[in-house]
């Protein structure tokens, strides 16, 4: 399978586990690099990476055939990590004060 084929399969079925696994395995360095940039390493980064792959699968319909699949994936990963980080900041800001302090 190629990245292009995996993205095409996800555009038809975002739940195609084989296609998600292929993209993750074939683009591990890019994905880990983007996640580390936004979330560092550890538990939060691991959770973010799982959500990131799900969101990339859901965005596969936005892929244009003339696009470079690697560039598309890197762009999606970056924008989705930015979105995830902003969601986490928003959630933490709206958490009750006592609970926010217990989460550090």
Could you tell me what each predicted segment is?
Residues 9-10, 34-35, 59:
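Short, flexible active-site loop motifs that bind/organize anionic cofactors or intermediates
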Residues 28, 46-57, 67-90, 94:
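Σ70-family region 2.3-2.4 aromatic/basic alpha-helix that recognizes the −10 promoter
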Residues 1-14:
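Short terminal alpha-helical segments
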Residues 11-33:
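A short, charge-rich alpha-helical start-of-domain segment used by transcription regulators
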Residues 4-5, 83, 91-104:
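Internal acidic/polar
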């Amino acid at each position: 399978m190629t990245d292009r084929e995996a993205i095409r399969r996800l555009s038809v079925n975002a739940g195609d586990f084989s296609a998600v696994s292929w993209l993750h395995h074939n683009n591990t360095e890019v994905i880990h690099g983007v996640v580390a940039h936004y979330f560092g390493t550890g538990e939060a980064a691991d959770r973010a990476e799982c959500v990131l792959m799900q969101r990339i699968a859901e965005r596969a319909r936005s892929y244009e055939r003339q696009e470079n699949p690697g560039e598309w994936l890197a762009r999606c990963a970056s924008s989705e990590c930015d979105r995830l980080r902003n969601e986490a900041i928003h959630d933490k800001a709206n958490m009750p004060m006592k609970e926010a302090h217990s989460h550090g």
